[in-house]
Every structure is written in C-alpha cells, then in structure tokens.
C-alpha cells in the first residue's frame, strides 16, 4: 500500500492517486463536543508541505465517497484504503467513546450512504492515544445500533503513538478487537527514525500468536529509506511523494517480491515474509 500522507483537501485525492497512491491518510480534527469537524492538520507539519489545507469533515467524506464509488465520474479504481488520523489529543479521555459514536454517524451518512452503494474503500481508524480505545467501542456500537454492523468488515484499527507493542496488544484486548489491526511506526519527515520498532512489529505480525495483521512506516520521502523499509518487510509506506515509492517498487530487487495492492487484496489478512 502506497499511502499518500496528509490528504486533507478534496482536490488532493486526485493529485495523490495520480502520483501512484492506492491509499490516503487524512487528518480529522474534533470540536469541543467530540464531533469530527475538519480534515485539517495545522502547523507544524511535514517539511516541504502546506500544513493548512482543509475541508469540513462531512464534505470531505462526500468527495471521498465519489472517488471510491464505481460508476462515479470521480471514481479511482485503485484507491482502496483510507487511514483517518484521528486528532483526539484535543479531547478529554472520557470523550473518546462519544468521538467514536459521532465519527460512525458521519461516515454512515456521508461515506457509506446509509449502506446504500456508498464508498467501497477500507477504512483504518488511527488513534494517537491508547487511553482513547473507547473510540473503537463507541464506533462499533453505533454502526450496530444504526442497523449496519456489516460495515465493520470494512474497518480496521491503528494506534499511532509508537507505544510499546505489548501495551498496544493489551489495549486491543480491552477494546475487544481481535483482527483488522494495522500497526504504524514512524516520525515526521523532518526527523530521522530507525527501524528497530518496525522490525519488532513485523516480528509480531509474522509470529503465530501476534496481534498485528499489517505494518506501515511513515513518513518516507527518500528512495534509500523506502528500500530500508521494504527490506524490513513492511506492508505499507506512507509518503508525501507516492511516485518515489512507486519508482522503488519498480526496481528489479523489489519488483519480484512486492506489488501494489488492489481492491481484491484483503487489508486485514496477514501476509507473512
């Protein structure tokens, strides 16, 4: 999965997919009442990027729905996965469940079109704080109570705080999550970060009793770092330059071992090295 980083304006969906992304990451900010409000990152952000592009969250979802609904004039067949980077640090811990409920309602209405031929992309809810695990339970409860538990088949999870892998596993237990787990590791492109924790995450994925299904590394903009991440066995790379990742995947060393995921590739299925 080539994951376009910080895609927060509807116009950027086309831009990143046309550069080679089959997945995008979108920032979601919340208001004081835990309603998802904007797709917005703000300052500071990655070096070389504009930090302030934004849409109203529900409007972004409508644009995203068009981009992922077969037959729509804006449809991109290869856009198959969306990571919502949920900026919950603005909330109190006890608002996490509400944030999940409100997020589910927004997605149900504006992305899934109330279960009636909505967008088809798989969705990863990426949460920065382990203490906010009730966002997951609130989300699940709402889809169930609204009569669409089947949409949970399209939803996966990530805790993005670079926490100890054992602590993440315990948190998923509390949230009742037993699959659909992506594990991120990374840092802003302005700084360097080694691959130690990525290797631990890959080892967990490849073990017989691990909780991780997929591992992705962020934010990678250079060819050398891309090669290092691929050598470590990641499933996804988040980038500001999808074309760079696509170029490296075309190199003879990687062409035989990796391919770009399509809609038929289940993002919740573990593919071991």
Swiss-Prot record:
<keyword id="KW-0325">Glycoprotein</keyword>
<feature type="glycosylation site" description="N-linked (GlcNAc...) asparagine">
    <location>
        <position position="250"/>
    </location>
</feature>
<keyword id="KW-0800">Toxin</keyword>
<keyword id="KW-0479">Metal-binding</keyword>
<keyword id="KW-1061">Dermonecrotic toxin</keyword>
<feature type="binding site">
    <location>
        <position position="85"/>
    </location>
    <ligand>
        <name>Mg(2+)</name>
    </ligand>
</feature>
<keyword id="KW-0204">Cytolysis</keyword>
<keyword id="KW-1015">Disulfide bond</keyword>
<feature type="binding site">
    <location>
        <position position="27"/>
    </location>
    <ligand>
        <name>Mg(2+)</name>
    </ligand>
</feature>
<keyword id="KW-0460">Magnesium</keyword>
<keyword id="KW-0443">Lipid metabolism</keyword>
<dbReference type="GO" id="GO:0005576">
    <property type="term" value="C:extracellular region"/>
</dbReference>
<keyword id="KW-0964">Secreted</keyword>
<comment type="similarity">
    <text>Belongs to the arthropod phospholipase D family. Class II subfamily.</text>
</comment>
<feature type="disulfide bond">
    <location>
        <begin position="45"/>
        <end position="51"/>
    </location>
</feature>
<dbReference type="Pfam" id="PF13653">
    <property type="entry name" value="GDPD_2"/>
</dbReference>
<dbReference type="GO" id="GO:0008081">
    <property type="term" value="F:phosphoric diester hydrolase activity"/>
</dbReference>
<feature type="binding site">
    <location>
        <position position="25"/>
    </location>
    <ligand>
        <name>Mg(2+)</name>
    </ligand>
</feature>
<protein>
    <recommendedName>
        <fullName>Dermonecrotic toxin LdSicTox-alphaIB1aii</fullName>
        <ecNumber>4.6.1.-</ecNumber>
    </recommendedName>
</protein>
<dbReference type="GO" id="GO:0046872">
    <property type="term" value="F:metal ion binding"/>
</dbReference>
<feature type="active site">
    <location>
        <position position="5"/>
    </location>
</feature>
<feature type="disulfide bond">
    <location>
        <begin position="47"/>
        <end position="190"/>
    </location>
</feature>
<keyword id="KW-0442">Lipid degradation</keyword>
<dbReference type="GO" id="GO:0016829">
    <property type="term" value="F:lyase activity"/>
</dbReference>
<dbReference type="GO" id="GO:0016042">
    <property type="term" value="P:lipid catabolic process"/>
</dbReference>
<comment type="function">
    <text>Dermonecrotic toxins cleave the phosphodiester linkage between the phosphate and headgroup of certain phospholipids (sphingolipid and lysolipid substrates), forming an alcohol (often choline) and a cyclic phosphate. This toxin acts on sphingomyelin (SM). It may also act on ceramide phosphoethanolamine (CPE), lysophosphatidylcholine (LPC) and lysophosphatidylethanolamine (LPE), but not on lysophosphatidylserine (LPS), and lysophosphatidylglycerol (LPG). It acts by transphosphatidylation, releasing exclusively cyclic phosphate products as second products.</text>
</comment>
<dbReference type="GO" id="GO:0090729">
    <property type="term" value="F:toxin activity"/>
</dbReference>
<keyword id="KW-0456">Lyase</keyword>
<feature type="active site" description="Nucleophile">
    <location>
        <position position="41"/>
    </location>
</feature>
<keyword id="KW-0354">Hemolysis</keyword>
<dbReference type="InterPro" id="IPR017946">
    <property type="entry name" value="PLC-like_Pdiesterase_TIM-brl"/>
</dbReference>
<dbReference type="GO" id="GO:0031640">
    <property type="term" value="P:killing of cells of another organism"/>
</dbReference>
């Amino acid at each position: 999965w080539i994951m376009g980083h910080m895609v927060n304006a509807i116009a950027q969906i086309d831009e990143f997919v046309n550069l080679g992304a089959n997945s995008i990451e979108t920032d979601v900010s919340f208001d004081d009442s835990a309603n998802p409000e904007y797709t917005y990152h703000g300052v500071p952000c990655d070096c070389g990027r504009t930090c302030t592009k934004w849409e109203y969250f529900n409007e972004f979802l409508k644009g995203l729905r068009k981009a992922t609904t077969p037959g729509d004039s804006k449809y991109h067949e290869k856009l198959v996965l969306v990571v919502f980077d949920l900026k919950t640090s603005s909330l109190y811990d006890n608002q996490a469940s509400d944030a999940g409920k409100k997020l589910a309602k927004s997605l149900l209405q504006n992305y899934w079109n109330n279960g009636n031929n909505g967008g088809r992309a798989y969705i990863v809810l990426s949460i920065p704080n382990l203490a906010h695990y009730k966002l997951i339970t609130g989300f699940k409860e709402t889809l169930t109570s609204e009569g669409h538990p089947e949409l949970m088949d399209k939803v996966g999870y990530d805790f993005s705080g670079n926490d100890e892998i054992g602590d993440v596993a315990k948190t998923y237990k509390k949230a009742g999550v037993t699959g659909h787990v992506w594990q991120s590791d990374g840092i802003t492109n302005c700084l360097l970060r080694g691959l130690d924790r990525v290797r631990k995450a890959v080892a967990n994925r490849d073990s017989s009793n691990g909780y991780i299904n997929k591992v992705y590394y962020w934010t990678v903009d250079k060819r050398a770092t891309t090669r290092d991440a691929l050598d470590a066995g990641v499933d996804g790379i988040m980038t500001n330059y999808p074309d760079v990742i696509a170029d490296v995947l075309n190199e003879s060393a990687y062409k035989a071992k990796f391919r770009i995921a399509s809609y038929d590739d289940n993002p919740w299925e573990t593919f071991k090295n």
